[in-house]
């Protein structure tokens, strides 16, 4: 009997690496947009700088991951998706 409450160890097991890379890129783009929006809407210069630093760190992380390294791509997708969820849920209040 299969336990359906646990996600598969690799949700991308039957997905080509090129598609995983596309998901990686789209997730990074979504998170960059959220960070950029918060930077533009910041109440202070310090807060704006903090969000902009996150934009730059994300850019650097995105550039550092080789397009063929599935493990790193998937790890970043998962990490960034959690951050996106946290930011979006904080918007909803």
Task: Tell me the role of every PLM-derived stretch.
Residues 4-42:
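N-terminal acidic leader/helix
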Residues 36-37, 47-51, 59, 63-66:
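Soluble, non-transmembrane alpha-helical interaction regions
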Residues 45-56, 71-78:
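Short, charged, amphipathic alpha-helical segments
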Residues 21-24, 70, 77, 84:
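Long amphipathic alpha-helices with heptad-repeat character
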Residues 57-75, 87-88:
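Amphipathic alpha-helical coiled-coil segments
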Residues 27-28, 35, 51-52, 58, ...:
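Amphipathic coiled-coil alpha-helices
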Residues 2-14, 75-93:
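Short, charged, intrinsically disordered terminal tails
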């Amino acid at each position: 009997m299969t336990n359906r409450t646990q996600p598969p160890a690799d949700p991308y097991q039957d997905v080509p690496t090129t598609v995983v890379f596309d998901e990686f890129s789209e997730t990074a783009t979504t998170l960059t947009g959220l960070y950029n929006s918060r930077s533009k809407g910041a109440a202070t210069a310090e807060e704006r700088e903090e969000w902009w630093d996150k934009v730059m760190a994300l850019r650097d992380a995105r550039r550092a991951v080789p397009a063929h390294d599935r493990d790193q791509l998937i790890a970043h997708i998962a990490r960034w998706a959690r951050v996106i969820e946290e930011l979006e849920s904080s918007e909803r209040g």
